C-alpha cells in the first residue's frame, strides 16, 4: 500500500476505525490522535496484499514515546480503514518493534 496516500487520507480525516475494534482501542488507551501521529511518523513494516478483507498493511509509528502498530486497509478511493492499533508485545517483537521474533 502507498504510505503517502495513507498519510494524506489520515491527515485529512478520511479514515474510519473498524467498529469491531473501537472498544479494544478504548481499553488500550489509544486515541485517534495517537493513530494519526503514528501513521504520520511511521513506516510500513509488513504488507498484506492478499488479505481476504482487502489489501492492508502494518505501520510502525510512535505516539509520543509509545510505539504503536497500526493496521490499515483500503475501503475505497475515499477512505482508509483503521483495522486495529496496538502496542507491540515485546514477547512477539524484537526491540526495534519491526521484526517478529522467530518461533521455534
Please report, for each region that a protein language model flagged, where it lies by residue.
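Ribonuclease/tRNase effector modules and their secretory precursors
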Residues: 1-104
Amino acid at each position: 500500500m502507498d504510505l503517502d496516500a495513507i498519510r494524506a487520507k489520515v491527515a485529512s480525516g478520511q479514515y474510519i476505525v473498524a467498529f469491531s475494534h473501537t472498544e479494544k482501542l478504548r481499553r488500550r488507551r489509544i486515541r485517534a490522535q495517537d493513530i494519526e501521529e503514528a501513521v504520520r511518523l511511521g513506516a510500513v513494516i509488513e504488507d498484506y496484499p492478499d488479505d481476504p478483507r482487502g489489501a492492508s498493511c502494518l505501520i510502525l509509528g510512535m505516539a509520543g514515546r509509545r510505539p504503536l502498530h497500526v493496521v490499515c486497509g483500503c475501503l475505497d478511493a475515499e477512505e482508509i480503514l483503521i483495522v486495529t492499533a496496538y502496542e507491540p508485545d515485546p514477547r512477539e517483537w524484537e526491540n526495534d518493534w519491526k521484526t517478529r521474533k522467530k518461533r521455534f
